[in-house]
Amino acid sequence: MRLKSGELSVGDIQRRFDRAAATFDESDYVHRTTCTGLLERLKPTTFDAAVIIDLGSASGKGTMLLSKKYRKARVMSVDVSAEMLRKSSRRKPLLSKVREVQADACRLPFLDHSVDLVFANMLLPWVATLDQCLNEVNRVLRKDGIFAFATLGPDSMSEFTSFTDSQRYPDMHDVGDGLVRAGMTDPVLDVDRLQITWKSFDKLLDDFVGCGALGEWPSDVRAEEQ
C-alpha cells in the first residue's frame, strides 16, 4: 500500500522535520501522548531486550524513556532528520548507550534479525510505502521480537481535511494486512480516541506546523485573514 505521503520525497520529509526540530517539543502533545500510551502497552512484556530501535524518533523523548525502561539495552534513535537527531543527542546523559542513526525507515542500515524491539511512534504516516517499511521492520527483528507502533487513523483531524494530511493516515485493517504480508505473526491492534481542545484555531495551526504535521500555514487560511 502506497500512502499519500509518497507525494513527498524522503528529502522533502527530511527538510520539513529539520525545520520543525526547533519547535517540535513545544508542539508535540499528540506525539507525547501516544508515546506514553505505547510504553504502557509494553509494560506486560517480560523479555530482555538487548537491541532496540526507536524508529522515527523525532526529538528523542521516546528514546530516552526506552533507555530508562530497558537499562541493559543498546537503544538506537533512528530518524530521517539530522536536526531531530542532534536534538535527541543533546538529551542523553554522559556514557549513554543510546546512538543516533540517520536513515529512511524503508531502507534500514541494520543486519537481518538483529533487533529485539522496534518502537515506532507516529512513523507510519511518513513512510512512502507501508509494505516496504513493514518488510524492513520484519527483516531486522529477531525471532520473537516485538514491533510496537502508534499511528493516526483516517478519521483523525477529520474536521480539517481541507488542509491536513489525513489522507496519509493508514486504515487499521490495511496496517493489519500489511503486518501479515510482511511475515509478522499474531498482530494485535486496537483503537484509542484522543480528544484535544486548543485555545484558538491559530494555536492549533501553530502546533501543526511546529511539530511538522504541516509544512506551513495553509495559504487559504492566510488569505482569509488578510
Label every model-predicted segment.
Residues C106-L117:
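A short acidic, Gly/Pro-enriched loop at the edge of an enzyme's catalytic core
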Residues D131-K143:
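A short glycine-rich, Lys/Arg-flanked "PGG" loop and its adjoining helix->strand segment in the class I
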Residues D116-T129:
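A short SAM/SAH-binding and catalytic strip from SAM-dependent methyltransferases
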Residues R2-T36:
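Class I SAM-dependent methyltransferase Rossmann-like catalytic core
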Residues V51-R107:
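Class I SAM-dependent methyltransferase SAM/SAH-binding core
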Residues Y29-A49, L65:
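Conserved alpha-helix/loop element of class I SAM-dependent methyltransferases that forms part
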Residues R142-K203, C211-R222:
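Conserved catalytic/acceptor-binding region of the Class I
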